[in-house]
Amino acid sequence: MYAFARKLLFSLDPETAHELSLDCLGAAERLQLLKPFVATPVSDPVEVMGLRFPNAVGLAAGLDKNADYFNALGQLGFGSVEVGTVTPLPQPGNPQPRLFRLIEEEGIINRMGFNNKGVAHLVAAVARRRYRGVLGINIGKNKATPEEQALSDYEKCMDAVYESADYIAINISSPNTPGLRNLQFGENLSHLLQGIKRRQALLHEATGKRVPIAVKIAPDMTDDEIKGVADALVSNQYEAVIATNTTVSRDEVPHSPHKEEMGGLSGRPVAEKSTHVIRVLAEHMQGAMPIIGVGGIMTGADAEEKIRAGASLVQLYSGFIYRGPALVSEAASAVAALS
């Protein structure tokens, strides 16, 4: 069935197809039409960050930026759904076109630029939660916010989403917000990580709820840079690291007509880079912090490879676009078979 839907969707502009598919999915969920078409979710409970995940396969941030569709997406068998990236204020993102399919390479290039309706909208949407799995909320800074004031944006988002989230993901690795990736290094990183942890402690005290925090990192770092980020996360007692975001490299797509497009590349072309980062993190941290593996998971075997490299959980995005809901159960079954 998805093969037919994909043929239709891939005949449309990528962003139009994205919006149409989510609108249809949301309508089907509201009318209670999804269940007959969805396989029984794979049950393979795993505890990570102090949370019990129904299975190890989650939906990565970026698909449901405003939490308008997470209840429907949650019915497709995911053990977790991560919504966002959301910023304090609404922003339109970058000019269109800003989303490109690399069909032969099973990749996607996006330069969306954190287009979202703002954190107030997201919190109102999450208040209508019916999804029973783990809900992550991915937060970022507004484009207009200077790097030196980035912490303030993350704090504003944390204040807003803290009581609604099962975990919070800190996005400092999108290539589509100018200067954002600079937050991954040196004093910028130390200042941000310490400030976010202070805010977490204050919110924990105020609410009585402990919400774990994961940090999402880029694949375009040297091994030494990866280890430096890992050391900073461990020393500041973060609960998890998400590896990885999209890549700015085009080494894996030398013949694509879209290779010159600016933006982050995801899907199969980033798989090897992502797995390498996971392996470096796992070998360096020696179990000090769980790793959530994301990047180029197109088959169950790809999910298994991420787990074998050192990830405790995995997330899908581009693979879900190319393969549809069948990939969720395929990946979850492959990971469950490792137990």
From Swiss-Prot:
E.C. code: 1.3.5.2
Species assigned in the record: Teredinibacter turnerae (strain ATCC 39867 / T7901)
Active site: S174 (nucleophile)
Keyword Flavoprotein: yes
Membrane topology summary: Peripheral membrane protein
Binding locations of substrate: K65, N110, R111, M112, G113, F114, N171, N176, N245, T246
Protein name: Dihydroorotate dehydrogenase (quinone)
Species classification: Bacteria, Pseudomonadati, Pseudomonadota, Gammaproteobacteria, Cellvibrionales
Molecular functions (GO terms): dihydroorotate dehydrogenase (quinone) activity
Subunit structure and binding partners: Monomer.
UniProt cofactor note: Binds 1 FMN per subunit.
GO biological process, one term: 'de novo' pyrimidine nucleobase biosynthetic process
The organism's place on the tree of life at top rank: Bacteria
Location in or out of the cell: Cell membrane
Membrane-spanning segments: none
